[in-house]
């Protein structure tokens, strides 16, 4: 392992030095920035600063409120507009080979009030359609011109809604629902598929750390710049898995000016958060940033407190005008006292036991996640841009707990069972390199990117070995304390996954309006599993995945698109794969999608619409052959749906954001083994997938005060494959009010589940369920210095 790390580091250094010696290219792209106030009037004499990792350009708007930049590299840039008497405004934009235009609307306020994609800003960028689509492609194109559904959730929007953890923030994307999975690992459902099976992948700054059980641990939103949700089969970006979506958590980066961000929050159940972020420019070429946060939550069920501590540090160095180097380290430590559900008494929620925790008093659920990377971006001669990322991640997790509760009518007692004991020790190292260039063929631009990824994922697992029945019976209303039986950890297995990946993407501008966009990914990953009880087993997989689509620009601000995409997914997440599962092939999934993305009515209305269908094949199903019950990969699952989101600004101070998703997810072919026989579930709905998810948020601004409310509706779901046990639909109401003062300070009061709705978001059991949190409030104070 040490040898592998040394080779990767040597490769990174060699590439960086070679590029530094050769780098001397410049770009030829053009960007036009139009600055207005919220009424649409042009703003002259505004300072416009355009920054990218290795360069900075400045200009001043003319009498028409326009600033122009030429000789730029294509790709993501940050536009910052400063004007006395207005709030300083920042926007991310994707500069393309063709002339690019972007509008920035300023709001009255002090210069020190810096706004990044403010939720109550004009609708022209509320959905960030002009931002670089980094979460959906490696090409330098904006979200508007990506033939797929990509939702960008900004830090500003997260703060406006008072959201503390990253998993909850993903519900700001249309149709996404979340839940607490086994081991209190956050779970996510998208387009009829769940992270439980590995069908939703988590990335950190564009790199997939591991399967969701590792990378999906709790994460404080204070550390993030944004969240990017790419829906549908996303193996092109995330590799195996990602049938339903890939989610990219993007951390904050060092800035070119001295800045400090602070956060203080306190709320129900003695929940508090503290956050401090400082960005320091040592010179014009060297800057560093550190963010520290601590969150503590007492929990709405007794003895279910949790604690999350995070430290993120980063350094950016620009040794030459054509070379950018970045390094970052992330340390997180979360300790959760999990809530595994409330027993249903006579098949109903009995409010007398709603807040009782039946788990053992000394249970343990703790994880330490560390992540580091070194990035280099070099501008080479003839317009080539070379990027390299060397990364490593570690995880240590320990579980000791009971995971089920059940009311026994005959005795009137509650059975506490499913004693679980596990430990993990993971190490992931890898390197990714890619090259980008815009070619000109027959006077038409062709954008290309190609690259190679190599990584090694080494996972050790311990269990409790053979443990006798540890079930306990307790009084449902006054349970006596239960303690850990004290079984030692026993080493169980090592799973080693070596991956080699080649990928490429391209965009061809057939005409000024019509563009074809596509990409392909070829992988070879070798899975070696060495288990104490079953011995050594090995299996290699070589899937090919990708996406191809077309985008037609009706106008520069209205696009139509269609696409086909393909992903693959193992029958069992690789982190927990068994020797028997290794003999099964990967499960392919295919999606067709069509839709539109538009900004109309002078930027007062922004909308996206998508119609999609996904088929996942070769899922495991039970059949009887010659009287013998066996598992075969002949099953199929499908989902069909429509998603619509809109942001409207009828007046400069009033914004309405809404989205609705209608979904039908069902089994086309699936047989379930019930022990006594095999039963077909063909035509049944897939459990836990709501038929409708709806959100609407009106927001009103009165001077420095902003007030908003959100109504969220989640439709009914089935709890089981037989579609016999129904989870009732639920509607929640939340609201927030914030006031800005002292230039850069904001005080926000947030209330959640204001109607005190009693509901179960998800349950795999017909005898218990995790009841959602009751009504709660918190107060948050943020300041930017």
Annotate the PLM regions.
Residues 513, 613-615, 633-721, 744, ...:
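Gram-negative outer-membrane beta-barrel transporters
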Residues 2-8, 13, 17-120:
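Periplasm-facing N-terminal accessory domains of Gram-negative outer-membrane beta-barrel systems
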Residues 370-395, 417-531, 657:
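Face-selective signature of the C-terminal outer-membrane beta-barrel domain
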Residues 129, 152-155, 160, 166-172, ...:
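Periplasmic plug
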Residues 448, 656, 685-785:
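Conserved C-terminal beta-signal and adjacent last beta-strands/turns
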Residues 375-381, 385-403, 553, 560-561, ...:
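Membrane-embedded beta-barrel scaffold of Gram-negative outer-membrane proteins
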């Amino acid at each position: 392992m040490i040898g592998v790390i040394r080779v990767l580091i040597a490769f990174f250094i060699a590439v960086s030095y070679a590029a530094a010696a050769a780098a001397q290219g410049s770009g030829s792209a053009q960007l036009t920035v139009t600055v207005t106030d919220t009424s649409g009037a042009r703003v002259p004499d505004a300072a416009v600063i355009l920054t990218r990792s290795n360069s900075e350009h400045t200009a001043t708007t003319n009498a028409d409120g326009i600033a122009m930049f030429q000789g730029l590299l294509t790709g993501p840039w940050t536009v910052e507009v400063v004007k006395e008497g207005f709030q300083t405004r920042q926007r991310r934009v994707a500069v393309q080979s063709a002339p690019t235009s972007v509008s920035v609307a300023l709001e009255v306020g002090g210069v020190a009030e810096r706004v990044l994609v403010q939720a109550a800003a004009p609708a022209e960028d509320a959905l960030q359609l002009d931002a670089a689509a980094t979460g959906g492609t490696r090409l330098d194109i904006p979200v508007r011109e990506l033939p797929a559904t990509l939702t960008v959730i900004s830090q500003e929007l997260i703060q406006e809604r008072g959201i503390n953890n990253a998993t909850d923030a993903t519900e700001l994307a249309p149709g996404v629902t979340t839940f607490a999975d086994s081991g209190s690992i956050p779970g996510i459902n998208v387009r009829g598929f769940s992270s439980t099976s590995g069908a939703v992948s988590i990335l950190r700054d564009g790199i997939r750390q591991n399967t969701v059980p590792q990378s999906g641990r709790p994460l404080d939103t204070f550390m993030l710049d944004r969240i990017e949700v790419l829906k549908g089969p996303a193996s092109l970006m995330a590799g195996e898995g990602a049938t339903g979506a890939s989610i990219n958590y993007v951390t904050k980066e060092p800035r070119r000016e001295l800045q400090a961000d602070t956060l203080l929050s306190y709320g129900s159940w003695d929940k508090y958060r503290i956050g401090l972020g400082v960005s320091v420019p040592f010179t014009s070429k060297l800057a560093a940033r550190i963010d520290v946060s601590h969150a503590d939550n007492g929990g709405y069920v007794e003895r279910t407190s949790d604690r999350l501590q995070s430290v993120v540090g980063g350094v950016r160095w620009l040794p030459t005008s054509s070379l950018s180097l970045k390094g970052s380290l992330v340390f997180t430590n979360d300790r959760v006292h999990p809530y595994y559900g409330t027993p249903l008494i006579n098949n109903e929620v009995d409010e007398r036991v709603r807040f009782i925790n039946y788990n053992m008093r000394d249970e343990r659920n703790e994880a330490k996640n560390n992540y580091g990377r070194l990035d280099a971006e070099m501008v080479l001669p003839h317009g080539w841009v070379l990027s390299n990322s060397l990364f490593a991640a570690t995880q240590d997790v320990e579980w000791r707990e009971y995971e089920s509760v059940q009311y026994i009518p005959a005795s009137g007692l509650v059975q506490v069972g499913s004693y679980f004991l596990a430990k993990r020790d993971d190490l992931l190292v890898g390197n990714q390199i890619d090259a980008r260039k815009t070619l000109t063929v027959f006077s038409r631009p062709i954008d290309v990117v190609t690259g190679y990824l190599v990584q090694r994922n080494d996972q050790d697992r311990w269990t409790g070995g053979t443990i006798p029945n540890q079930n306990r019976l307790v009084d449902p209303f006054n349970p006596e304390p239960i303690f850990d039986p004290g079984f030692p950890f026993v080493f169980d297995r090592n799973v080693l996954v070596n991956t080699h990946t080649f990928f490429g993407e391209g965009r061809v501008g057939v005409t000024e309006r019509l563009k074809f966009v596509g990409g392909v990914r070829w992988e070879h990953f070798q899975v070696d599993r060495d288990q104490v009880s079953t011995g050594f087993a090995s299996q290699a997989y070589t899937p090919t995945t990708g996406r191809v689509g077309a985008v037609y620009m009706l106008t520069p601000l209205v696009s139509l698109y269609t696409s086909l995409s393909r992903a693959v997914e193992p029958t069992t997440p690789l982190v927990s794969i068994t020797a028997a599962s290794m003999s099964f092939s990967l499960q392919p999934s295919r999606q067709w999608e069509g839709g539109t993305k538009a900004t109309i009515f002078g930027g007062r209305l922004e909308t996206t619409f998508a119609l999609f269908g996904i088929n996942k094949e070769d899922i495991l199903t039970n059949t009887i052959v010659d009287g013998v019950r066996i598992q075969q990969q002949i099953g199929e699952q499908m989902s069909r749906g429509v998603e619509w989101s809109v942001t409207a600004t009828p007046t400069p101070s009033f914004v309405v954001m809404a989205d609705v998703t209608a979904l039908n997810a069902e089994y086309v072919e699936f047989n379930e083994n019930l022990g006594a026989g095999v039963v077909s579930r063909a035509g049944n709905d897939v459990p836990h997938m709501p038929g409708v998810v709806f959100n609407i948020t009106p927001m009103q601004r009165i001077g420095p005060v902003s007030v908003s409310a959100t109504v969220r509706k989640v439709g009914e779901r089935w709890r089981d494959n037989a579609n016999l046990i129904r989870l009732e639909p639920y509607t929640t109401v939340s609201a927030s009010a914030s006031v800005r003062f002292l230039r850069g300070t904001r005080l926000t009061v947030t209330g959640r589940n204001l109607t005190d709705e009693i509901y179960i978001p998800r349950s795999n059991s017909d005898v218990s369920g995790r009841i959602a949190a009751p009504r709660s409030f918190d107060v948050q104070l943020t300041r930017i210095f």
